[in-house]
Every structure is written in C-alpha cells, then in structure tokens.
Curated annotation (Swiss-Prot):
Classification via InterPro entries: Ribosomal_Su5_D2-typ_SF, Ribosomal_uS5, Ribosomal_uS5_bac-type, Ribosomal_uS5_C, Ribosomal_uS5_N, Ribosomal_uS5_N_CS, Ribsml_uS5_D2-typ_fold_subgr
Segments forming domain S5 DRBM: 11-74
Quaternary structure note: Part of the 30S ribosomal subunit. Contacts proteins S4 and S8.
Any GO molecular function: rRNA binding
GO BP: any one term: translation
Keyword tags: Ribonucleoprotein, Ribosomal protein, RNA-binding, rRNA-binding
UniProt-recorded name of the protein: Small ribosomal subunit protein uS5
Gene designation: rpsE
Protein species of origin: Neorickettsia sennetsu (strain ATCC VR-367 / Miyayama)
Cellular component aspect of the GO annotation: small ribosomal subunit
Comment, domains: The N-terminal domain interacts with the head of the 30S subunit; the C-terminal domain interacts with the body and contacts protein S4. The interaction surface between S4 and S5 is involved in control of translational fidelity.
Family membership: Belongs to the universal ribosomal protein uS5 family.
Its job: With S4 and S12 plays an important role in translational accuracy.
C-alpha cells in the first residue's frame, strides 16, 4: 500500500458527504462545512480525505487536494474485480467483499458503490454490516482492499510459482 504520484494520472472526483458542523464557543456557535471526497483514476488508484472550511466550495477543494495526496494503488484482477474474498472490521463497521463474474456489476450500496466506481472495479459483491456512516465505510473499504493480495505477490513472498495459488476455476 504505497502512495501514488497523482500528477500524471487522469483523475475523477466525487463528493461522498457534505455536513454542516458547529463549534460551540463562549460567543455562540460557529458553523462550518465538512466535506468527504474521493479521487480515483478508475484503473486501481483511489484516494479519500475529509476537510472543513467556512464555505462548501473551499471545503470541497481542500478535501480533493488532500485526497490526491493520499492516493493508494490496489491490485485488481483483469482490471475489473478483486483476487479473493476479504472481511474487514473497523470500529463498528464490518465489510465483506467478494469477486464477481464478468457482467455482474457493482452489488454494493451507498458509499461503497462510489468507492468501487472511483477505484475502477466493475464486478464485485460487497456487504456492509454495522455502522453505515459513509466515512467509516470508505475507511473500512480501504482497509479491506489493502488486505487483498495478487497471486504474483503471494508467490513472490513464498518463493513459489504463481500457478500454485490459482485454482482451476479461475484460470478457465
């Protein structure tokens, strides 16, 4: 899981959440806006960040800038799905992701669907349990996708051939 240089990528932006938040001081309430943004190239790189500012547009541009700096590359199988099932837990959020056959589409809800679209995953099944807050679901998705390993990576770590890790069903 390495940060990616975003300057030479063709990026797409998506706002996941906008919320008006307040800070209570001696003089009263101070309102500002919190924006959560996703940035991705739809080819395996995605970044997520949140930012606060007094104006929505300023908060959005700040969140997008931070998300570009936090971009991560994930391994995809055939450029459309993941290599294997994965379960992840972060706080009260639980997430199960599973590869799907070609043509299935993105079977996921809300923030997880946006995350998969920005990442470039076109066939996946994802189920989120527990907390459905968009920010925690996306952070949990980043954790889950970072647990997915390609057969090449596993073969290299174990000094084995890649064919030892691929089932016959996948190769056909």
């Amino acid at each position: 899981m390495k940060n990616v240089d975003h300057r030479n990528l063709d990026l797409f932006e998506s706002v996941v959440d906008i919320a008006r938040v307040s800070k209570v001081t001696k003089g009263g309430r101070q309102f500002s806006f919190r924006v959560a943004a996703l940035v991705g190239d739809k080819k395996g790189c995605v970044g997520y960040a949140t930012a606060k500012h007094d104006e929505v547009l300023d908060a959005r541009s700040k969140a997008v800038r931070k998300a570009k700096g936090a971009m991560i590359r994930f391994p995809l199988r055939e450029g459309r799905t993941i290599h294997h099932d994965c379960f992840s837990k972060l706080g009260a959020s639980k997430l199960f992701i599973k590869p799907a056959p070609e043509g299935t589409g993105i079977v996921a809800g809300g923030a997880m669907r946006k995350f998969c679209e920005m990442l470039g995953v076109s066939d996946i099944i994802a189920k989120s349990y527990g907390s459905s807050t968009s920010g925690i679901v996306i952070r949990n998705a980043i954790k889950a996708f970072s647990l997915v390993c390609s057969p090449e990576y596993v073969a290299g770590k174990r000094n084995r051939k890649k064919s030892k890790f691929i089932s016959k069903a996948v190769t056909q």
